[in-house]
Amino acid sequence: LPTYWEKVRPLLEGSPVKVSSIGFYCNALENEGQRKTLEHFIDNAHLFGTDVVTTFAGALEGQPVEKAIPRYKEVFGELARRAEAKGVRLAIENCPMDGTWHKATCNIGFNPKAWEMMFDAVPSRAIGLEWEPAHQMVQLIDPLPQLEEWADRVYHIHGKDATLHWDRVRKWGVFGAGEFAESRTPGYGDTDWRDVFHILYSRGYVGDLVVEGFHDPIFKEEREWAGQLHALEYLKWCRGGTEESPW
């Protein structure tokens, strides 16, 4: 990372752009090398001017979420102490990575029931969430009440939305016979991001919201940057822009 920072630094000098977080998404519960790399990220986040390292909670792959909690407590207890010493916060992305509660893949931190277990096992405030509505919507979870409840543990936010096709749910169900959810660029999905900002403001959120692209089924390839630029302007307006809304 120090070598990489020397490449990044000239690109940022004289620019208003800052690094909101650095991320290493891994399974530190089962992979010792990945755990060491995550420690390296914690130790070097300060080089990039950020105190947020984003990651996964790990898992015992193929096993239920609750089976991983003792190992999570062991590994992330140590990582939390390291982060506290460095003034760093770990933000666990709320992405299932195609796993389920009964058969997790590389991240148990995708569901609020798991968050309760994780934060009970390791209460340190050095561990929180990297949150977005899309990963909750694909679980048929209403994201806004969830954000209201968990806002004080949200340390970083991805600007990514989803569209739920309820007609497909009614026709095919949710066990994979047909796709019922699509990731969308903010401004094209089901979420009114004014509501997201209202919750963040009311709960005193201090942090960043970054557009996550390369998922939208329409705004991809040659349309990718058009979609991301639209998302940026849309989110700035939802945040409280001064121009009249075109939407």
Each model region followed by its residue ranges:
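Active-site-proximal beta-strand/loop segments in catalytic clefts of secreted hydrolases
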Residues: 24, 93-95, 160
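Conserved beta-strand positions in the central sheet of alpha/beta enzyme cores
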Residues: 21, 54, 91, 155-158, ...
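Active-site acidic/histidine proton-transfer and metal-coordination neighborhood
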Residues: 5-6, 11-14, 18, 28-128, ...
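N-terminal small/glycine-rich loop or linker at the start of catalytic domains
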Residues: 18-26, 175-177
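Residue-level signal for short, function-critical loop segments
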Residues: 25, 59, 133
